[in-house]
Amino acid sequence: MNRKHFLRILSAALLPALLSACAAQRPELYAMRNGGSHQPFYFTDRYGELAFREFYDWAGQFVGDRAVVERDGKWGYIDRSGETVVPFRYDWAGSFGQYGFDEEVAMVKTGMDRDRIPLYTPCPTALIDRDG
């Protein structure tokens, strides 16, 4: 068997495995909003179908199995089924893995003036793990 045929057979055998590995790393749910800034956020699958019937004032994309969401001025985290896994008790929250932290840690703030920039507001700040 010459080298050309060997490479064809090898790429035919490995390509499906590589493509499925790449597809598995893509997010399965997406935070979406229709229209202007006053419309609620919701989550869809990759085909645009509504994933669950929860709507949020703001929503971030999933990082692993958690997404940061805001409802009625408080921030918390949901899992991929839409269940609240970290209660809506923070005045601001970042996504897991944001601001240079690894994907197991997120920054949250309490006692924050809502008219200020969250990252630079002097107020009680904490790092939480995926369970809050």
Residue ranges of model-derived segments:
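N-terminal export leaders
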Residues: 3-7
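Bacterial N-terminal signal peptides
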Residues: 11-20
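Homeobox/homeodomain signature
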Residues: 8-9, 118
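Residue-level detector of conserved, function-critical positions
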Residues: 23-132
